[in-house]
Amino acid sequence: MKKTSLLLFIFMFSLFLSGCRQKCSVTPLVRGISFSCTVKYYNECYDGEASVAENGDTDIKITSPEGLSGLILHFKGDDATAEYSGFNYKYNISEMPEGMAFTYLYEMLRAAKKGEVSLEDDKYFTESKKGSRICRLYLGATGLPISAEDASNGFSAEFKNVTVMGK
């Protein structure tokens, strides 16, 4: 009887440990969507509206703070264009210094497309690493993004009104 109890305990304990961070069947739905979001990065807060095409091309319009309101960012692969008051600036995101909040958000969404989804503490997420940064994009049960964070630098994003385009 003691052996059976011990075996049962070991089995239950191993199930408990394996459930701490398990792989799951949720697929990230980070393309073909539109959303509004609030991004906090380096003690600054930004609001924006975004659309991500099926091919990954992403447009983000910054709506606040007032000094940046109206700035539109177009991302395609590693190339980006910033538009503001009729002026355009083209750049390669890999050549820009870290610190551009919405560029960081775009990179997280792009990495999530091919990321593996895990489950921890009843939260689905993808994790991507770039240098010392460890970025997590949290997903709902449908695969749509809910929030994102990088504890190493204080980056966080909250997704609102996420909709699948064309549906």
Predicted regions and their residues:
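Sec-dependent N-terminal signal peptides
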Residues: 6-13
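Bacterial signal peptide processing site
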Residues: 21-23
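An acidic-aromatic
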Residues: 52-109, 151-158
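Gly/Pro-enriched, hydrophobic low-complexity segments
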Residues: 59-64, 115-167
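C-terminal motif of bacterial Sec signal peptides marking the signal peptidase cleavage site
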Residues: 16-19
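Post-signal peptide N-terminal segment of mature Sec-exported envelope proteins
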Residues: 27-54, 75-76
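Positively charged n-region of N-terminal signal peptides that target proteins for export
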Residues: 1-4
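Flexible, processing/modification-adjacent segments and terminal tails
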Residues: 25-35, 39, 82-133
